[in-house]
Amino acid sequence: MNEFDRNWISYTKDLKHPQNEAKIITAIKRSRRIVFIAKGRVGLATKMFMQRLSQMGYHVAHSEDLLIPEMGSQDIAIFVTASGSTTSSLAYIEIAKRCKCKTLAITFNAKGEISRQCEQIAEYPEPKEKGLMKSYHEVGFVYIFERIISFLPTEQFVHTNFE
């Protein structure tokens, strides 16, 4: 087993957080629409999660989409941020508040500005090892999101590949 494997086996134990998972799952299930705000490599991991949710029948959008549905009090804006203070995401908090949209931060840093402004926070422990790219954040989010998917009902799952 190499160093990467040892680090990840150890780290995934830290990412199992039933209270956070319940909070995120409840927010997803209770929302009419879900808009995700996430940037960079974390944004890529989030888009993978969005695809899974879409295949399960949830109505999802990303802040970078050209057509974001009108948001309201039955919807949620989920901010996925490793730092908790991604500058380009901060403006979306004000938009969500104006729409009376619920807000949730999924982060490794609950002390960041985004976390302070969101109604709910799901904080996870920062990876101890930094790896080649100086961060394992996006891989941590992939693991977190896959755990969440594993707890959601699959009755409405639709496989969208055409092969």
Summary of predicted features, one role per range:
Residues 6, 19-23, 87:
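Generic alpha-helical secondary structure signal
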Residues 156-163:
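A short, charged, Gly/Pro-tolerant segment at domain boundaries
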Residues 1-15:
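Generic N-terminal amphipathic, Lys/Arg-enriched alpha-helix
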Residues 33-144, 148-149:
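Glycine-rich phosphate-binding loops that contact phosphosugars or nucleotide phosphates
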Residues 13-30:
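A short, well-structured juxtamembrane/interface segment
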